[in-house]
From Swiss-Prot:
Positions of 4-amino-2-methyl-5-(diphosphooxymethyl)pyrimidine binding: 185-189, 217, 256, 285
Protein name: Thiamine-phosphate synthase
Lineage: Bacteria, Bacillati, Cyanobacteriota, Cyanophyceae, Synechococcales
GO CC entries: cytoplasm
Cofactor: Mg(2+)
Pfam families listed in its UniProt record: ThiD2, TMP-TENI
Binding site for Mg(2+): 218, 237
Cofactor remark: Binds 1 Mg(2+) ion per subunit.
PANTHER family the record matches: THIAMINE-PHOSPHATE PYROPHOSPHORYLASE, THIAMINE-PHOSPHATE SYNTHASE
E.C. numbers: 2.5.1.3
Keyword presence, Transmembrane helix: no
Keywords (A to Z) from UniProt: Magnesium, Metal-binding, Thiamine biosynthesis, Transferase
Length: 353
């Protein structure tokens, strides 16, 4: 008789445990699902989460609910300081994904003998969530990059070909970042790959310190190696569809455009942003004739993604470029050739404000 009481009590405790972890898993899935729905607008991410939540709900039988006893739960209401430090959507997603995965593992272990169907479902969902979590975090990263891109008014393009001194390069870029520049593109046409990698790594670290976007010109392999925020490609570089396959969906992809046909093609192919120019004559694009302010005006009428006027732009010409319709500009010499790159950057930003 005593053995039967002990067995019944053990089953009741396991039922309580299963009830709590079903609640925990479903609640965590709902948190993730709602961010994918309202925060990311991604129905492809919402659908599996909703399906998993419904399947767990169907297996949340009344016998588990009847075993619930919140009043006697010794850990009810127990908190942890880490719970108050989740200040971003990715942090909340990571925490809730871990919560769900842990709950599902508990359901597997304790459900094998009591409820094999539930244990099997929990295992399937747990492995599915491992992969889906990565996709969701990638989508969060892309969204964050997109928001920062839309907020950027001034893009600094480096010019290490003029000066092979890494210390001076970093000094100029850091000065610009201190002034508020939030987008840096690393561009080097000369030199070797070892040199490029060293410079790109140093610039990526510097940009991360200031929470600025870091874009690599031309080189997708280099961008991936240093974990850059994206790549900028010229008209003679890879088609955007092939570039996207290599780069992945979470990073930014830019394209240089010199006429309306280029702009429309780039947008159709999924460019995240555009370079529009060269507006004026520039030493960095000697092979291209200036497109002039008329091209800026035309771009302003057709561009559906963020775009930067580029080419020979400095503090003297910005007013005319803005009057032609540009809200964002990219510069090289106006900052990198200045005796005071921080002040030059600050003045440019004030003019664009």
């Amino acid at each position: 008789m005593e053995l039967m009481v002990v067995e019944a009590d053990a089953k009741l405790r396991v039922a309580r445990l299963i009830d709590a972890n079903l609640d925990r898993a479903r609640e965590g899935l709902r948190v993730i699902e709602d961010w994918c729905r309202f925060g990311l607008d991604r129905d492809d991410l919402v659908l599996p989460l909703k399906d998993w939540r419904q399947r767990l709900g169907q297996q949340h039988h009344d016998r588990y609910r009847r075993a619930r006893s919140t009043a006697t739960d010794v850990a009810a209401g127990l908190g942890h300081p880490a719970q108050t430090s989740r200040c971003s959507a990715p942090a909340i997603i990571k925490a809730n994904a871990s919560r769900v995965q842990e709950a599902l593992r508990v359901l597997e272990e304790f459900g094998r003998n009591l409820d094999p169907d539930l244990a099997s479902t929990a295992a399937e969902i747990r492995y599915g969530l491992y992969d889906l979590e990565v996709r969701i975090l990638e989508a969060c990263g892309r969204q964050h990059r997109q928001e920062r891109l839309e907020g950027a008014k001034l893009c600094l393009i480096t010019d290490p070909d003029r000066d092979n001194n890494l210390e001076r390069l970093l000094h100029g870029v850091e000065a610009a970042l201190m002034a508020g520049v939030s987008l840096v593109q690393y561009r080097r046409k000369q030199g070797n790959d070892k040199q490029r990698l060293l410079e790109a790594q140093a610039l990526k670290t510097l940009c991360s310190r200031f929470e600025a976007l870091f874009i690599v010109n031309d080189r997708i392999d280099l961008a991936l190696l240093v974990d850059a925020d994206g790549v900028h490609l010229g008209q003679d570089d890879l088609p955007l569809s092939e570039a996207r396959q290599l780069l992945g969906p979470e990073r930014l992809l830019g394209r240089s455009t010199h006429r309306l046909e280029h702009l429309l093609e780039a947008q159709q192919a999924g460019a995240d942003y555009l370079g529009v120019g060269p507006v004026f004559a520039t030493k960095t694009k000697r092979d291209l004739s200036p497109a002039g302010l008329s091209w800026v005006t035309e771009a302003s009428r057709h561009a559906a993604v963020p775009w930067f006027a580029i080419g020979g732009i400095d503090i003297e010409t910005i007013p005319s470029v803005r009057a032609a319709g540009a809200q964002r500009v990219a510069v090289v010499s106006a900052i990198m050739s200045s005796n005071d790159p921080e002040e030059a950057s600050r003045t440019l930003l004030q003019t664009l404000a």
